[in-house]
């Protein structure tokens, strides 16, 4: 007669909702490059599933490799602004490190935020160029349609920066307090699923943006 001793760990409610995830270290945010040659994705570290790095799978060769290690580009604990915390929660973005990224329309470059700053990688070149390095926490970062500029929100104002020259321009300057430029207000994010407040024209010569004035909204203290 054979007997088998099962030493399985008892599954508790606390374990279900704690790290590491029970579904394993699955890739996230999979995207096919515009030229169709590779698939990029985010994947957690073996030592911490919630600390994400940027990877690629080359379709023709079958090679999988890490493009960027988030620890190499940013050291220390990531401190998010309140606006970024709320934005990530509504976009269902979890984890730390490289939590999002985007391809340029021509498939020749990648842009990704990390720790409130911005990194840019041109295919065929080594490393990532840090385009922003400030005390502020930039959010809603985008590549312009032709890939010549990045745009972002800083301190409730809209900015653009020319990648080649490094010239930065404030599109708005009056943001702050109850005034927000280029930012989706609470109702837009929560009820409409709109997470941005500005849009490039296809030829990247113009930007349409919103102005939100929350001055008429009553401030109510909520005790939790």
Explain the meaning of each model-derived region.
Residues 2-224:
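Beta-propeller folds
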């Amino acid at each position: 007669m054979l007997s088998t001793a099962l030493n399985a760990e008892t599954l508790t409610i606390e374990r279900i909702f704690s790290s590491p995830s029970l579904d394993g270290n699955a890739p996230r945010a999979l995207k096919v490059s515009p030229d169709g040659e590779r698939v990029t994705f985010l994947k957690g570290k073996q030592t911490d599933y919630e600390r994400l790095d940027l990877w690629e799978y080359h379709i023709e060769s079958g090679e999988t490799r890490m493009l960027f290690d988030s620890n190499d580009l940013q050291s220390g604990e990531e401190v998010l602004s309140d606006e970024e915390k709320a934005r990530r929660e509504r976009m269902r973005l979890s984890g730390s490190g490289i939590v999002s990224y985007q391809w340029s329309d021509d498939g020749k470059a990648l842009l990704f935020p990390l720790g409130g700053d911005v990194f840019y990688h041109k295919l065929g070149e080594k490393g990532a160029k840090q385009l922003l390095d400030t005390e502020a926490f930039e959010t809603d970062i985008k590549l312009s349609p032709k890939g010549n500029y990045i745009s972002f929100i800083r301190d409730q104002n809209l900015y653009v920066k020319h990648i080649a020259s490094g010239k930065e321009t404030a599109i708005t300057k009056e943001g702050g307090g109850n005034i927000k430029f280029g930012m989706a207000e609470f109702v837009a994010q929560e009820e409409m699923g709109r997470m941005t407040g500005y849009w490039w024209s296809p030829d990247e010569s113009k930007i349409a943006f919103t102005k939100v004035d929350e001055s008429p909204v009553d401030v109510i203290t909520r005790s939790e």
